[in-house]
Amino acid sequence: MENQELIKQVTEKAEKWLTPAYDAETQAEVKRMLENPDKTELIDSFYKDLEFGTGGLRGIMGAGTNRMNIYTVGAATQGLSNYLNKCFAGKKDISVVVGHDCRNNSDKFAKISADIFSANGIKVYLFDDLRPTPEVSFAIRHFGCQSGINITASHNPREYNGYKAYWDDGAQVLAPHDTAIIDEVNKVTVADIKFNGNKDLIQIIGKEVDKVYLDMVHSISIDPEVIRRQKDLSIVYTPLHGAGRVLIPDSLKEWGFENINCVPEQMVKDGNFPTVVSPNPENAEALSMAIALAKKIDADIVMASDPDADRVGMACKDDKGEWVLINGNQTCLIFLYYIIKNRIAMGKMQPNDFIVKTIVTTELIKAVADKNKIEMRDCYTGFKWIAREIRLSEGKQQYIGGGEESYGFLAEDFVRDKDAVSACSLLAEICAWAKDQGKTLYDVLMEIYVEYGFSKETTVNVVKPGKSGAEEIKAMMDNFRANPPKEIGGSAVSLIKDYKTLELTDAQGNVSKLDMPETSNVLQYFTVDLSLIHISEPTRH
């Protein structure tokens, strides 16, 4: 009975998409779903509206209210335009940057968004082709814009696309603007969307921004001399068909590296990602072609960026000469260890310097920071929180690096999102520094463990798609809260941190408050054998 009622509701909702307000292609797709005896696709496409969350939109592409298409993207852009015109009502020239990655329909969604912004009187700096997410963040700051968007679904499967919204500092939107934008987006109907653009307000940008951005990225090199000595470092790089192909090889060359070997089949822009199961640089499968090339040429390092070039995965040879993946925690550890140790060694460290990591990233980073007397801050998962720490400290302290276990790293403050362009360049410098001492990156990692303590981290992703999946994940989180484990892996739980209630509970049941800027659906269990288990609900865009 419940299912019949749901089918009735989604059918009524879908039939509204058969009106002239929607194009013929969309109407044909909706009609096909309505006529299909199996209503699974119809239900999942229309059972809810694709939520414009604090990070923007993300969803499967197709017709429907719960899909990424020109109407859901259009509503998001119209809502953001409305908010910008309210928020900056006294400003003469409101402007935004619009970028996109390699995904199917990304360029189409970007152009439609540019038209809508311009139709609302907002000047648009539109990238001429795909660009890395961090360059979009940089361009917002470079042009002094009030906002910006990037059409991307990061490393999600090929069926997905997304819409990331940024504020005037180049960071993803935070409170109070995030919820205010959501309110505006939720008010928009298809009739409200201004699709007819004003070409006089759209400025195409490209190589001139690339040059300024790459010059700034080059400025963060800590030890150019070691690169000069190791300029022939053998690097294998793959963009996994994405936006990294545009700038990462150029950045490596600008830093002075001369032996850059790109995986040719994966240098081709392709939103279907034909050479990988999923374009996620965390996965061994995604790096298999790069590692095969590395074995063939006896390379020193393998790096892969995801489709929008904000995350980077890395592999190197272990002590037996076998190629191994370096996970996000290990990469972040090496990244920040090098920044701290070598800034100190070269006399570049200042008393007000600080680093940032997320609460789910390895605690060994804190050990490195503490021993070297550098301030380290913990923040929520997501680079917008790292960007928040940078913004709060502007003019008072200097951010020198940060990262998260999900393969996102940032060594500069002129970008306010994770940056695979600068990260690949700096990781190559770290590899050159190691080789200059007769070591590998693996040797460096082992030395860090010996000095600061051994640690092993594992990430388990549980994927539950669709409406039923969202309900199942919610039930799992509710159960953990209602029935917290007394022991994990044979070790008693000594402390629980609940970031949804902002409560810390010790083994005796004493409760105290956690000092965080807002709540987040994250649970942490600390055990007596010093294990730490994080459980979190994924952010839904």
Regions found by a protein language model. Name each.
Residues 7, 14-113, 203-232, 243, ...:
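An N-terminal, well-structured beta->alpha segment
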Residues 17, 21, 25, 41-45, ...:
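Gly/Ser/Thr-enriched, mixed-charge loops and adjacent short helices
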Residues 48-66, 153-156, 239-247, 307, ...:
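Conserved phosphate/anionic-ligand binding catalytic regions in large, soluble enzymes, centered on
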Residues 537-541:
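Short "domain-exit" segments at the C-terminal end of structured domains
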